[in-house]
Amino acid sequence: MSKKNSDTKQLEILRYIYDTVDHRGFPPTVREICAAVKLSSTSTVHGHLARLERKGLLIKDATKPRALEITDEGKKELGIKPKRIPVIGVVAAGHPILAVQDIDEYFPLPPDLENDAGELFMLKIHGESMINAGILNGDNVIVKKQNTANNGEIVVAMTDENEATVKRFYKEKDHYRLQPENDTMAPIILPEVTILGKVVGLYRNNID
């Protein structure tokens, strides 16, 4: 196979992997790739996958049978723009502040969260009330939109004064407790609370 044909076949494989993950949420097997791109030998497919990995277009996990992840470079090669999630302002992790719903910018979506892309947003933390949970002042949290939570989960919640805060959630006998992860701070006790979402990720890099 000529280099041009080999490169074309590798892009065909890359496209098939992307489409399969996008459609069903997990990568194809090597035999599925064989059938899709009309190659009879699994060893030939393994060779193409190895070359895609060397080019930085694909990441393979040798400990798992079908753990294939297309890199941002790989998506660029396919002409696919990385998915992004909205950054919708600032939320307090100390004293609650008014929630900001305006979209300030967008942040590249981590590959492991792509299946939830439409349900995610990012907020910047101000304050130190969650430091014992490893959430520091200036961190960026990724939040999955949902209106329920289990006890002990870290949520973004609206208080009865229409303010947003990041705290650990507890539903108790006759009230809700929004518990800070800082031994010097008291919990917020509320008769009612509205949950905006659950914290599912954390980024410490500056996104500005």
From Swiss-Prot:
InterPro entries: ArsR-like_HTH (IPR011991), LexA (IPR006200), LexA-like (IPR039418), LexA/Signal_pep-like_sf (IPR036286), LexA_DNA-bd_dom (IPR006199), LexA_repressor (IPR050077), Peptidase_S24_LexA (IPR006197), Peptidase_S24_S26A/B/C (IPR015927)
Any Gene Ontology biological process: DNA replication
The protein, known as: LexA repressor
GO molecular-function term, one example from the UniProt record: serine-type endopeptidase activity
Site positions per UniProt: Cleavage: A93, G94
DNA-binding region: 30-50
Species lineage: Bacteria, Bacillati, Bacillota, Bacilli, Lactobacillales
Record-listed E.C. numbers: 3.4.21.88
Active site: S129 (for autocatalytic cleavage activity), K167 (for autocatalytic cleavage activity)
Disulfide bridge partners, by residue number: none
